[in-house]
Amino acid sequence: MQDNIFDKVFRRSCSDDIDKFATRDAPDEYRRLFEEIQERYERLRGEYSRYKGAFAEFVIISQLKSEAFRMNDRFISMMENLPADFEFTEYGNVWSYHSPPLHDPEFQIDILAKAKGGGYSLIGEVKNRKAKFSVREAKAFQEKAGELARLENVGKAVLFVFSISGFHKNTLAYLKKQGIAWSADRRWLDAPKAGR
């Protein structure tokens, strides 16, 4: 019986606080907690995507440095829209290119492979993500690649795009019309064979 009296007194004196907590404070607290967790999730997802992209760039750069010219037919079969006389060659330098300091606009190209002899150099864009590659991205890449070719004095070059998730149909038509090579072949991401 005493518990019942205590409960009635407690509810009467604290009912406003209980109602306020149940209808406003608790949902606000959970909303803030959810937003904080969502923000952390987005940050981690962004880092994961960045690492995924960097991994793909690294593996493709390794393939171009050590494997592509040795297994020319295999690597050509993984590409579309290459010039008829294209062959992978030994590249003097293969790296991810960043525009010089104070260059306006600042830009970054995923892969620049400069040919040693008279072969084709490669300027590449790498996308290792779920979304397909779009025409808008192709135009932006083409613009950056043109600026890179001018800055680095790259003469004979092939632009190429690697997109693990493929391309929109209108993007393939655009790439073909512009003479840009492309690939969605996962074999590019196979680790290069050691000791060759």
Model-derived features with residue positions:
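Basic, amphipathic alpha-helical patches used to engage nucleic acids or provide basic targeting signals
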Residues: 123, 133-153, 173-174
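Short beta-strand-loop-alpha-helix junction that forms the active-site gateway
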Residues: 126-135, 164
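Domain-level recognition of nuclease-like catalytic cores that cleave nucleotide substrates
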Residues: 153-196
